[in-house]
């Protein structure tokens, strides 16, 4: 009940140029949720819409704020704004950035957040479906007959050909796909039986990826 009640206390303070999440409870200030704390602070010119939006709300309390209209005028407002006002908004952006950096220093990822699984480069690749086996056979022919055809159009033609192919002819590709699937199951089982890659293997793979990026 306590956690459920605390979740209802999240209050969103909306700035037209960006979002700042302030969480209040009766006795203490709660940290921002992980989904929002990781977001970067928007640039200073996004804050130029704070005052116009607030002013519009005060003058027209019953009317909804048309954010798109403010957004279109944002660039023009930033160019024409007085130097004093510009400095004000830049200070606001700096304060937001400083607050973000302080929060991120103490940020601890939630226990439920999963780390990216290590992908073994030597693991067997998933086998193609019958349709993709069909495509790999007929794609070169279509490209040869229609060299200027886009990728999307090539795929459309292949899909049309596959749909018009007789069921008896499709069996050839379906049987081939089934055999590849059975082989994949055996190969993946053997790979898993060997166990997860050790830390040394991970370091080698990481070093190889880093080397490729530099090249």
From Swiss-Prot:
Coiled coil: none annotated. InterPro entries: HMG_box_dom, HMG_box_dom_sf, HMGB, SAND-like_dom_sf, SAND_dom. Keywords: Coiled coil, Cytoplasm, DNA-binding, Nucleus, Phosphoprotein, Repeat, Transcription, Transcription regulation, Ubl conjugation. The keyword Disulfide bond does not apply. One of its GO terms (molecular function) is DNA binding, bending. This is Nuclear autoantigen Sp-100. The gene is SP100. Transmembrane segments: none annotated. Residues 32-108, 124-192 bind DNA. SUPFAM superfamilies: HMG-box, SAND domain-like. A motif (Nuclear localization signal) lies at residues 72-89.
